[in-house]
Amino acid sequence: MDQLRQSLLDAPIIEKGDYEYFVHPISDGVPMLEPGLLREIVIKIIRKANLENVDKIVTPAAMGIHISTAVSLMTDIPLVVIRKREYGLDGEVSLHQQTGYSEGDMFINDVNEGDRVLVLDDVLSTGGTMKAVLDALDHIGADVVDTVAIIKKAGPNELDDSDHHVKTLINVTVEDGEVVIVDEHGDD
């Protein structure tokens, strides 16, 4: 059975303003994340992503961390977390991200010009976070080998008119307070 698909169909929906938001272990940490679901997702990422010559996995805090940690453990590729806190370290790069329900600054450390990176995140919805991350990595001069989001919420996003392509594991929409699977295989 496809645990990711079923877990999304079972996900509760809440409203944040005009935004219908599904609550899911991958995107929210609640309900609890079962090891089998995480394992299934990691295997799918490893099969879908281009990992050849990747130097670093890069993920925004906070909900990309558990996924990226598991992928790092399975591939022996080091992990860089883009933090919401500034540390003032040499080479730190700031970015501003805006989503459908929040905005703020984030900070990248330990990514340098010429680094070959895999960008991982939990959800691609408005594209605000992913666009800000990819633009910052371009500014640094990193080579983004591949970009993967676990779940894509259907609809327009900020990456639609950009040169950036994001692979996904599953695409969904929310209709009448329920998650609907749009593409159970996601985007390649």
From Swiss-Prot:
One of its GO terms (biological process) is purine ribonucleoside salvage. PROSITE patterns: PUR_PYR_PR_TRANSFER (PS00103). InterPro entries: HGPRTase-like, PRibTrfase_dom, PRTase-like, Pur/Pyrimidine_PRTase. The keyword Repressor does not apply. Keywords: Purine salvage, Transferase. It holds the Pfam family Pribosyltran. GO terms for molecular function: transferase activity. This is HGPRTase-like protein 1. It comes from Haloferax volcanii (strain ATCC 29605 / DSM 3757 / JCM 8879 / NBRC 14742 / NCIMB 2012 / VKM B-1768 / DS2) (Halobacterium volcanii).
